[in-house]
Amino acid sequence: GEYLAENVRTQYLKLRGEKLNAADFDLFFKGLVWNQTDPVIEAWQAYYTLESAQAENNQSKIAAALLKAKVLYRDSKAVTDPALMKLGDRIAEADRTWLWTRVMILLQKNRMTETKRVLETLPRPELPAPMKELRSIIDEPTLWLRRQKNLGNLPARLAVFASVRIAHLRPADAARIAQAAVDPKANAFWRSLVWSRIGFPATTQLNPKASSWYAKAGSALQQSPLAVVDAQQLAAWHARALIRDGSWYGLSKVIDAMPAELKREEVWTYWRGRALASRGLKTDAQTAFTSIAHRTTFYGKLAADELGRSYGFSNPPKAMPRQVEIDKGAGNT
């Protein structure tokens, strides 16, 4: 009975979310036990929370609701679902300064149809170029790039837009744009975003320049975290590029700069230990390896190997077999 009721409430909120008011939505939402974190339902919940705060004209509630909604939109894997599209529209109505950030979020997510739809809603003076040119970058990026006689003439925002779009396809071409027009014209945050977005696909494609492109990003991504999609993924792939290069000092720096949650993952605990050991910091390396060497996981076993220890047991025996028992068992074979 509970499962059926939960399923009915969930489907009702998904189908009727846009037709409800804040009070009715909240009534059904509070009745959910397991599905409050469903992406579509979360989007409608954020939508109505913001709507209620605006109706009250409570500025602190509006600020809190906007922050929650922006984080949800940035992190969602379903930005083309109608619920997320409506949420994005409401955020944009409440905060006009977020308009261009929304475009760049969609571009990073490689959601080109939705990017074009949102671009059409922006006031023309806020666009970095005519819509025809922006559509050309989205739909025919290679052809658009061939038509550019001098990349250095591109305005900063247009260069950022084109770099992020083209990085998905050809990181080397995006790097050309970044060197010519992003580096000399854009601020530190946008330079950092562009080079991170170039470094990421370059690493997955095993491009030997990946780590050098990543290095150009610096640390300015932290200046506007709400505009960065999958920041932890970007950091992780930067580390992988350095592992591939055997750049141990650089790897230590990148891992040390990771968010605490990511840095605690055993994969990065292990590689931090490897980096420290390669730099001659044996005591620090052993501390890192020891923290995970008891685990039965892949990296736990690798850490045990580094320490010369036996692997951990998921269900350890009460006592190790004695030699006489081993010999007896061998005699029965």
Ranges and model annotations:
Residues 1-333:
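Extracytoplasmic and endomembrane cell-envelope/extracellular-matrix remodeling and assembly machinery
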